[in-house]
């Protein structure tokens, strides 16, 4: 899955 963290996916 895609998890967007710290400004990126």
From Swiss-Prot:
Q: Which UniProt keywords apply?
A: Antibiotic, Antimicrobial, Defensin, Disulfide bond, Fungicide
Mind telling me where the Cyclopeptide (Arg-Cys) (interchain with C-9 in subunit A) cross-link is?
Answer: 1
User: Which cysteine pairs are joined by S-S bonds?
Assistant: 4-9
The keyword Amino-acid biosynthesis belongs to this UniProt entry's keyword annotation:
no
In its record, the post-translational modification comment is: Forms a cyclic peptide with subunit A (PhTD-3) or with subunit B (PhTD-1). An additional intersubunit disulfide bond is formed.
Instruction: Please provide the Gene Ontology terms (biological process) for this protein.
Output: defense response to bacterium; defense response to fungus; killing of cells of another organism
**Disulfide bond as a keyword?**
yes
Tell me its family. Belongs to the alpha-defensin family. Theta subfamily.
Outline what the protein does. PhTD-1 and PhTD-3 have antimicrobial activity. In low salt conditions PhTD-1 has antibacterial activity against the Gram-negative bacterium E.coli ML35p (MIC=1.5 uM), the Gram-positive bacteria L.monocytogenes EGD (MIC=1.6 uM) and methicillin-resistant S.aureus ATCC 33591 (MIC=2.5 uM), and the fungus C.albicans 820 (MIC=1.6 uM). At high physiological salt concentrations the antimicrobial activity of PhTD-1 decreases slightly: E.coli ML35p (MIC=2.0 uM), L.monocytogenes EGD (MIC=1.7 uM), S.aureus ATCC 33591 (MIC=3.6 uM), and C.albicans 820 (MIC=6.5 uM).
What is this protein's record name?
A: Theta defensin subunit A
What lineage, starting at the top, does this entry show?
Eukaryota, Metazoa, Chordata, Craniata, Vertebrata
